[in-house]
């Protein structure tokens, strides 16, 4: 048994799925599966995740795509209405929607969240995003100007304060620079504590998360380097030390698995060979538009040309046993609560994960309840 495996058996890891609310999931490749988003597809994915004992699903919000030959993310559902539908057809799994905070006032989001809390019987939470892609908001006349890049988290801090006040007390009178509440009311309030996710990686994003959020989502890094994200978690730990709050990190990985390492690697190489250069170039241009937030933002990593075919998220490529062992290593990084997974082929990938990968994971023994064979 490796040291990582020994550690993993004593540390349970939560696992969620980043469901494909946009076309083609997270692969900017002509050689990857091509599909449109639909409620039916996301329902099947979410029910499979629930069936296999996974802990949560999250949907993003994307209001304008990257174009290219694959029309990457040009076709997207809306996050809250999708999750409301999923809340009605599931029974156990937790559900997180993403709020585009430049579009939706916080009092409206607080009420929508309370409604889905009612539909789901307390299984709903919220991911807050500031908005980094100017064309998403400029097309609606809602872009506040490029100076916003440097003040995104000041805006989001007031937004989160309004949410917390309404959820916890049913009333907000916040008088801020961006929001002015006047005896704003919310009832009914959520029956369960409403959890907030943030995915900010900049210093300002980390400070916000440590102050207002419950979970921080970050990108994994590299191919089959499952602990390379550790410096990001360390920065959150430093931010948490200033606020004294309990905030755990969740790491985004793409899983590309097959019966053998060689077969999985062949799929990965095939996807890379079909990379949609036009869509990737557009992503790079959008990432360069923010000259105020520093070099450590999510969009900087997404637009890096190293592995832009899957927006540079951490990638786990290998046999089912290889991927299980790599995932067990993730939880060895202190401060890590779990992972958020995407798959090249979501339906098959989830079934393979549930039946062939998860049973081999020491960090998921609390779900499988099985005595595990040694993984080489």
Curated annotation (Swiss-Prot):
InterPro entries (alphabetical): Luciferase-like_dom, Luciferase-like_sf, Pyrimidine_monooxygenase_RutA, SsuD_RutA_monooxygenase
Binding site for FMN: 61-62, 127, 136, 152-153, 202
Superkingdom of the organism of origin: Bacteria
Coiled coil start-end: none
Keywords (A to Z) from UniProt: Flavoprotein, FMN, Monooxygenase, NADP, Oxidoreductase
GO biological process, one term: uracil catabolic process
Listed Pfam families: Bac_luciferase
EC number: 1.14.99.46
GO molecular function: alkanesulfonate monooxygenase activity; uracil oxygenase activity
Catalyzed reactions per annotation: uracil + FMNH2 + NADH + O2 = (Z)-3-ureidoacrylate + FMN + NAD(+) + H2O + H(+); thymine + FMNH2 + NADH + O2 = (Z)-2-methylureidoacrylate + FMN + NAD(+) + H2O + H(+)
CDD domains, alphabetized: Alkanesulfonate_monoxygenase
Family: Belongs to the NtaA/SnaA/DszA monooxygenase family. RutA subfamily.
Known role: The FMN-N(5)-oxide reacts spontaneously with NADH to produce FMN. Requires the flavin reductase RutF to regenerate FMN in vivo.
Protein name: Pyrimidine monooxygenase RutA
High-level lineage: Bacteria, Pseudomonadati, Pseudomonadota, Alphaproteobacteria, Hyphomicrobiales
């Amino acid at each position: 048994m490796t040291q990582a495996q020994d550690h993993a058996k004593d540390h349970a890891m939560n696992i969620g799925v980043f469901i494909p609310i946009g076309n083609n999931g997270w692969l900017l490749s002509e050689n990857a599966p091509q599909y449109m988003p639909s409620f039916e597809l996301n329902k099947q994915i979410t029910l499979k995740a629930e069936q296999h004992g996974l802990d949560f699903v999250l949907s993003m919000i994307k209001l304008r795509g990257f174009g290219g030959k694959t029309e990457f993310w040009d076709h997207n559902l809306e996050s809250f209405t999708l999750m409301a539908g999923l809340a009605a057809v599931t029974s156990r799994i937790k559900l997180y929607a993403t709020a585009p905070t430049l579009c939706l006032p916080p009092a409206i989001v607080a009420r929508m969240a309370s409604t889905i809390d009612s539909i789901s019987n307390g299984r709903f939470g919220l991911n807050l995003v500031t908005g980094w892609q100017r064309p998403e908001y400029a097309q609606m006349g809602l872009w506040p100007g490029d100076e916003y890049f440097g003040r995104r988290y000041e805006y989001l801090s007031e937004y989160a304060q309004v949410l917390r006040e309404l959820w916890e007390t049913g009333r907000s009178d916040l008088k801020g620079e961006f929001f002015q509440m006047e005896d704003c009311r919310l009832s009914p309030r959520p029956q369960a504590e409403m959890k907030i996710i943030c995915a900010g990686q900049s210093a300002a994003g980390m400070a916000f998360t440590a102050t207002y959020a419950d979970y921080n989502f970050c990108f994994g890094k590299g191919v089959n380097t499952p602990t390379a994200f550790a410096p990001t978690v360390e920065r959150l730990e430093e931010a948490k030390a200033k606020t004294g709050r309990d905030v755990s990190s969740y790491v985004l990985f793409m899983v590309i698995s097959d019966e053998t390492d060689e077969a999985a690697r062949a799929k990965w190489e095939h996807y890379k060979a079909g990379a949609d250069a036009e869509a990737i170039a557009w992503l790079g241009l959008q990432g360069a538009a923010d000259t105020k937030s520093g070099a450590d933002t999510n969009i900087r990593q997404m637009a890096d040309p190293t592995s832009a075919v899957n927006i540079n998220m951490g990638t786990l490529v290998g046999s089912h046993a290889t991927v299980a062992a790599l995932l067990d290593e993730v939880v060895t990084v202190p401060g890590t609560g779990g992972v958020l997974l995407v798959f090249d082929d979501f339906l098959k990938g989830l079934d393979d994960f549930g039946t062939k990968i998860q049973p081999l994971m020491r960090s998921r023994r609390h779900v499988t309840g099985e005595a595990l064979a040694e993984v080489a």
